[in-house]
Swiss-Prot record:
Taxonomic lineage from the root: Eukaryota, Metazoa, Chordata, Craniata, Vertebrata
UniProt name for this protein: Transmembrane protein 248
Region (Disordered): 78-106
Transmembrane domains' residue ranges: 21-41, 179-199, 270-290
Organism name: Rattus norvegicus
InterPro entries in the cross-refs: TMEM248/TMEM219, TMEM248/TMEM219_dom
Length: 314
């Protein structure tokens, strides 16, 4: 009568076919990996690989800039009714425009204002300003923040609107100027091609951002990371000045993620692949339980021949 001993057959199968056992284990591990990856895509938001740059990565580029506010710079008075030049479009005008995208390149530079953290770290000789400094402005080129291609040569005007006046009152109070941290309104003025085309950060309004009654702005020189670590680095680059640093905190809402439909499709493909691999492993396992040890085992010695052994015995 035909009988099957599953455990004995499985032991014989494992001992007689080690490579196939290793293959089964590898396929099982791959199936588990695909299953885990599919579940990960289902529950997690994944950054889209098709979008090379979003506003998070763009604003992080400014973290590498050093801004020098020199004590010798001339203050320029601003009136509260200062308006944006006619040659510059605000981002609101750009959004409401019905022009096709290709005409934006001919419309001139645009303004985009975002809130950002600005740290001003005065050096010891710096004595501060007697006037209320509310605006810092600078001009850089695209390559200074790591842009490439045509955008590397584009000019970017940066204006920081401080929420409160920055003057020498605190310097006189403490005997020296201390580091100050502002949540400033940074206005970037550049060609439309410089900016990412993804979801934009919340905007601030420079004209109503500062509570000072008298406005003064001062020019700052910018230095990128490549210049800072170059061999001809000047240690007295910002002597008798204050070094400004920009800090952007990552905003998850600005990251472009893979759409839900695409994530579901990826999850479905990974699940189908893992199921197929599991079926393959289960099939081989059932075969091992039923078949057991093979009927004929090949000898490890290639010179072994049963016919020759029989003739020798005769």
């Amino acid at each position: 009568m035909f009988s099957i001993n599953p455990l004995e057959n499985l032991k014989l199968y494992i001992s007689s076919r080690p490579p196939l056992v290793v293959f089964m284990i590898s396929v099982s591990a791959m199936a588990i990996a695909f299953l885990t990856l599919g579940y990960f895509f289902k529950i997690k938001e994944i950054k889209s690989p098709e979008m090379a740059e979003d506003w998070n990565t763009f604003l992080l580029r400014f973290n590498d800039l050093d801004l020098c506010v020199s004590e010798n710079e001339t203050l320029k008075h601003l009136s509260n009714d200062t308006t944006t030049p006619e040659s510059t479009m605000t981002i609101g005008q750009t959004r409401s425009s019905t022009q096709p995208p290709q005409s934006l390149e001919e419309s001139g530079p645009i303004n985009i204002s975002v809130a950002i953290t600005l740290t001003l770290d005065p050096l010891k000789p710096f004595g501060g300003y007697s006037r209320n400094v509310t605006h810092l402005y600078s001009t850089i080129l695209g390559h200074q923040i790591g842009l490439s291609g045509r955008e590397a040569h584009e000019e970017i005007n940066i204006t920081f609107t401080l929420p409160a006046a920055w003057n020498a009152d605190d310097c006189a109070l403490h005997g020296h100027c201390e580091q100050v941290v502002f949540t400033a309104c940074m206005t970037l003025t550049a060609a439309p091609g410089v900016f990412p085309v993804t979801v934009q950060p919340p905007h601030c309004v420079p004209d109503t951002y500062s509570n000072a009654t008298l406005w003064y702005k001062i020019f700052t020189t910018a230095r990128d990371a490549n210049t800072k670590y170059a061999q001809d680095y000047n240690p007295f680059w910002c002597y008798k000045g204050a070094i400004g640093k920009v800090y952007h905190a990552l905003n998850p809402k600005l990251t472009v993620i893979v759409p839900d439909d695409d994530r579901s499709l990826i999850n479905l493909h990974l699940m189908h692949t893992s199921y197929f691999l599991f079926v393959m492993v289960i099939t081989m396992f059932c075969y091992a339980v039923i078949k057991g040890r093979p009927s004929k085992l090949r000898q490890s010695n290639p010179e072994f021949c049963p016919e020759k052994v029989a003739l020798a015995d005769a």
